[in-house]
Amino acid sequence: MHEGTWRLPPCPRPEVVSLASALGLSETTAGVLVRRGYGDPETARTFLAAETPAHDPFLLGDMDAACERIRAAIAAGGRICVHGDYDVDGICATALAVSVLQDLGADVGWHLPSRFEEGYGVSADTLARLAEEGCHLLLTVDCGITAVDEIAAARASGLDVVVTDHHRPGATLPDCPVVATRPSSYPFPELCGTGVVFKLAQALGVPNLERHLDVVALATVADVVPLVDENRGLVASGLKRLARTTKPGLRALMASARVDPAVVDAGAIAFRLAPRINAAGRLGHPKAALDLLLTEDPQEAGRLAAQLESLNRDRQSVEERILREALDQVEQWPEAKRRRRGYVVAGEEWHRGVIGIVASRLVERFHRPVVLIAGGEDGWTGSGRSIPAFDLHGALAACSDHLERWGGHRAAAGLSIDKENLEAFAEAFGAHADGVLAEDDLMPSTHIDAVVRGADLTLSLCEELEALAPFGLGNPGVTLLAVGCELSALGAVGDGKHLKLAVTHEGARSGAIAFGQGAQLDRYRRALQYDVAFKLQANQWNGTVSPQLVVKRIFDTPDRYAELRKWLADQWRADPGERTAEAAAIFAELELVEEEAGRRHLVESPTFLDILRESFPLAA
């Protein structure tokens, strides 16, 4: 297989048939639901309805006490200051908190930290300044749960504090009301920071709160929290609200990003809207993004959206430059260093605001954990991204003797380091990765939701699969696989970056686009068969709508595939008592009976895949 392989979880056919009958779905869609844990008809109906569960907001941490403090501050006419963060979730949480507090008649101010001057979280200097400026109550959003000492000092100076957050707490909580997903008896701990503020607004009884679901959806998708349970309902409802939003800032942002409000989805948020909001905090100060979300003036909204558009273009340019320089470094490494299973790449004057994005792109390129470090006169800071098999947080812990500060989680982390320790850290990190990662861990594996035939790829199937949206973490877009395809009508598009092609499977031909695979044009022109992994979508062109394959990966179909199909056909025709053990196992795994032969694909059998991929000898 080229570029890794694919994996297909097992799926009991009787459950698929039963669910398809109960819900009136194709077996393809029913199979996707069963593989994702929605095999029970009622559970599947609830999932497809994407309604927001009515979880009680007062189960969320110290909600009663928080509401009491906020209401008291409003009644006393005291100023409430909302302290947020510089990413999309922190900006949206600040905008939502400011808006709902104003709806309740509060005197509200806000503070967003600079990534470069204050860094993440709550600083003692900031809290002291806010107290001096007359802040009566500090409300943190998307931050604060680990700021134990800072909040203690603020309270000692007379500043009242309420913390709302969704990050993991330390061993000790701040000595104030804490509204957070952990620790809590709340039944769904995966809300983003803006989602927590939304629950606070519910508890406060803010009227007409649904009008702010557009901002909640924006933050929930951007913060890459699981789109299941309450998050799924919030995003589904929020996307409908976003399509008809009256907020001038969001309308201007969609216009600037060329997003049609009528068809806005989670993908548009993740890849078009969120990067523009993030650009403000990545390259400068997040104030412009917050102003955009809060403004009631369409002209100001247009000006601010244009400013974010310019910042996002600058971000893209800086990102591409750093990526090129990082790739050049790796290419110049000696062969032994390139074979390391974990990379550390460092550069002078790289922009700290984008190194996390570049680290993610390097992980995609090299399929191994990467730490990217930017240095300058004010020190060296790094951002790391990982692969599923590697615990990045654990790796930094193992190498912590070389670091000044570090933190994060399994998939992503940050650090600061002294320049003199760079080489030692790179060596220690690479050695740790070599010790815990196997060669197979570095091979990308594409998760398949269902195996299909060319005749299955219809607009009706597009509509069924779209009902599983919104897609994101915990509910990824559906990936289908067609095995043994022929590729034709190949041509490079988009300055040679992408491929347009036709995919034919068992005589049924479909149009396809393969983004970022323009360099593979000559390879795919070979007269071979391929296994194509793709997402199915409805494509509108010149007034017509047709199904289109958005290709994720194309794998060489193993040479033995045709031989194995013929062998199994012979085994099927043989008397059951004369079949080999391998053939009998394959037929059992496919749950085949005489009248249903051919209803399932051979690659749904683990035994068949083992024989196909490992070149086991075939018994006669």
How would you describe each model-predicted region?
Residues 2, 9-136, 157, 205-206, ...:
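Hydrophobic helix-and-loop "lid/oligomerization" segment in the mid-to-C-terminal part
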Residues 8, 163, 178-181, 217, ...:
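Structural signal for conserved beta-strand scaffold positions within catalytic alpha/beta enzyme cores
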Residues 97, 232-275, 279-329, 342, ...:
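Acidic, two-metal ion nucleic-acid-processing modules in DNA metabolism proteins
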Residues 109, 162, 522:
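Conserved beta-strand positions in the Rossmann-like core of class I SAM-dependent methyltransferases
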Residues 120-121, 143, 515:
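Short gly/ser/thr-rich secondary-structure transition/capping motifs
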Residues 130-133, 137-225, 231-234, 396:
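Conserved phosphate-handling catalytic cores of large alpha/beta enzymes
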Residues 166-167, 351, 409, 498:
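Histidine-centered active-site/metal-ligand motif
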